[in-house]
Structure formats: structure tokens, C-alpha cells
Amino acid sequence: AVLGSGARVFFLAKAEIEKWPVFGKLAKSGGTLFIQRGSGDSIKIREQITAFLKQDIPVLFFPEATTTDGSKVKKVHGRILGAAIEAQRDVQICLICYVNQQGGLDQVSPFIGNISFAEHVKKVLEMPQVTAHLVALPAICTAGHTVESLTALVQQKMVQGLADLHHKVLKSQPNMQQA
């Protein structure tokens, strides 16, 4: 919601979200592209993303294929980045850091763990003030990149960018090892 609030973008999400009552319908009506992990859908989705990008319609997705607690960057799955290469469009990395009132990483805002989405929304609505810090890194030109080289570069930029963001906004620094 933080990233999608500022611009018209299409969001890439796991297929299970499409079946969620209310939120699934909202996501679908907002133009979300749903992908079934491990089903071979990634080729079809990549083609759709390429078509959107060629029309200058941004597509938002989590390259780690999940959300995290914000303490570190997980492995980037780069297959979808191939769409940006095919469409000859830059890749824009955005990082979010949720900071609680004590100046540490907030553990309620990120949708992680084994709770339902409804439970998560309830916890978010009940929590004290949290600040979402959003940073957009310089765009990465995809020209001359393979999926592998672009994935490695995105991984490196995300790790360094998150470390820099933590240094800037947190009172105490989490362990920044890559997962």
C-alpha cells in the first residue's frame, strides 16, 4: 500500500491472494497480476509484464518473492526481471523500513509469519504509531544485462541500500547478513 499509493502501477502477487474475500476482489479490480508459484506461469506473467512495460505501465513486485521483517534482504528471484530487459526499461528499486516509536524495526507492520491477513490488518489497526521510510534507489539501466547479471546487481543494491537506510533511520542496527 505504501508503494502503490503514489502512482498507478500493476502489482504482482501470489495466486492465493486472488481468493481472499474483499481484498482479493480489490486487488483484482486494481489490476493485480496473480502468479501461481512453481506452475510455469512465470513465462506467461513475464510476457504480460513485458507488454505493460513497453506501454510505460510500471509493475511492482517483491523480487524476494515474499515480504520480510525488514532486517535483511533475502535471495532475489530474478526471472521476472527478464521482462525489464526484454522491454528495455530501467529497474527501480524501492526499499521500505517500518520504524516503531522506540526507533527500532517495527515487527507488526510487515505481513510475515503464520497469521491470516485479517489478523494482520487487525494488529496494524491496533498498533501504536509507526513511520514507514521509503527510499527509491537510482534506476538501473537494463541494457547489456542478462537476467543473471541484473539479478546479482539488484541483490547487491538492495543489500547496500537497506544497510544505508537502517543507518539513517534506526537507533540500533539489526544484523544485516543476507538470508
Task: Describe the predicted segments one by one.
Residues 16, 39-42, 73, 114:
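A conditional alpha-helix N-cap/helix-loop micro-motif detector
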Residues 21-25, 57, 71-153, 165-175:
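A cross-family acyltransferase "interaction/gating" segment
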Residues 34-36, 137-143, 156, 160:
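Polar-ligand-bearing catalytic/cofactor-coordination segments
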